[in-house]
Amino acid sequence: MSKIISLVVAMIAVLALPIRGQQQPLSQCTPSMMTTVSPCMGFITNSSSNGTSPSSDCCNSLRSLTTGGMGCLCLIVTGTVPFNIPINRTTAVSLPRACNMPRVPLQCQANIAPAAAPGPAATFGPSMSPGPETDPIVPEPTPAAQTPQSDTTRPFTPSVDGGAPTSDDGGSTSRPSETPSSAYALSPSLLFFSIALVALKFY
């Protein structure tokens, strides 16, 4: 029993270190907080019938977020919520002023500023492939003594490793890169919960 308790305490300590050091701002918006601001969705996505001003329900839900969900409110106002919502940044930024809450953008700057330089993130699972290099690739000049190529193109032949096809004449193909929406990271709390279940199963 004491081994399991010490294992659980060690896991909590290990999982709490990256969380305390990083405080990712995107994790501050939960689905329940997004439900709270659902009256504002029509306004910040430019799909409301009113279009020019938010409803009183929207402003009230915005005020309720200032007490317990300022981080989420800042993400909504800046248009960087971690959900797939087509937020119009211009109308989202104007939302606090339209609701007569002019201090919200200043509070958001103070709230977001420390999270601008997080430490290295520990992710579990596939990560995005690196982007293209900034230095342009300059092809080497071809020597003049080469034999002339025929005008007909050669057909593509599959490579030995079965990967992407290549051509005999030096042509290249590119592999599709992983998009941010297809990349994922495993939540530390989910990892902890899974390990705790395994530990309890063998107890």
Swiss-Prot record:
It comes from the Eukaryota. InterPro entries: Bifun_inhib/LTP/seed_sf (IPR036312), Bifunc_inhib/LTP/seed_store (IPR016140), LTSS (IPR043325). Residues 173-203 form a propeptide. A lipid is attached at residue 172 (GPI-anchor amidated serine). Residues 144-156, 169-179 have a biased composition (Polar residues). Its main location: membrane. Disulfide bonds join 29-74, 40-58, 59-99, 72-108. Expressed in seedlings, preferentially in hypocotyls and roots. Also observed in siliques and sepals. Glycans are attached at residues 46, 50, 88. It is a lipid-anchor; GPI-anchor. Residues 1-21 form the signal peptide. Belongs to the plant LTP family. Probable lipid transfer protein. This is Non-specific lipid transfer protein GPI-anchored 20. It comes from Arabidopsis thaliana.
